From Swiss-Prot:
Listed Basic and acidic residues bias regions: 26-36
Compartments where found: Host nucleus, Host nucleolus; Host cytoplasm; Secreted
Gene Ontology molecular function, alphabetical: metal ion binding; RNA binding
Compositional bias annotation for Polar residues: 7-18
Keyword tags: Acetylation, Activator, AIDS, Apoptosis, Host cytoplasm, Host nucleus, Host-virus interaction, Isopeptide bond, Metal-binding, Methylation, Phosphoprotein, RNA-binding, Secreted, Transcription, Transcription regulation, Ubl conjugation, Zinc
GO cellular component: extracellular region; host cell cytoplasm; host cell nucleolus
Miscellaneous comment: This virus is cytopathically active and was harvested from the brain tissue of a neurological AIDS patient. HIV-1 lineages are divided in three main groups, M (for Major), O (for Outlier), and N (for New, or Non-M, Non-O). The vast majority of strains found worldwide belong to the group M. Group O seems to be endemic to and largely confined to Cameroon and neighboring countries in West Central Africa, where these viruses represent a small minority of HIV-1 strains. The group N is represented by a limited number of isolates from Cameroonian persons. The group M is further subdivided in 9 clades or subtypes (A to D, F to H, J and K).
PTM info: Acetylation by EP300, CREBBP, GCN5L2/GCN5 and PCAF regulates the transactivation activity of Tat. Phosphorylated by EIF2AK2 on serine and threonine residues adjacent to the basic region important for TAR RNA binding and function. Phosphorylation of Tat by EIF2AK2 is dependent on the prior activation of EIF2AK2 by dsRNA.
Protein name, entry field: Protein Tat
Top-rank taxon, per record: Viruses
Disordered: annotated segments: 1-44
Short sequence motif named Cell attachment site, residue ranges: 21-23
Amino acid sequence: APEDSQSHQVSLSKQPASQAGGDPTGPKESKKKVESETETDPVP
């Protein structure tokens, strides 16, 4: 039972951080990087 509880807690702790902190900043920064790369090095 304790292992199940720990696993659940880790999943719960990991999900919010990924969705609240990584999700909004991830895609946004990723898009910016891709745009910057495309602008600096346009595809032939």
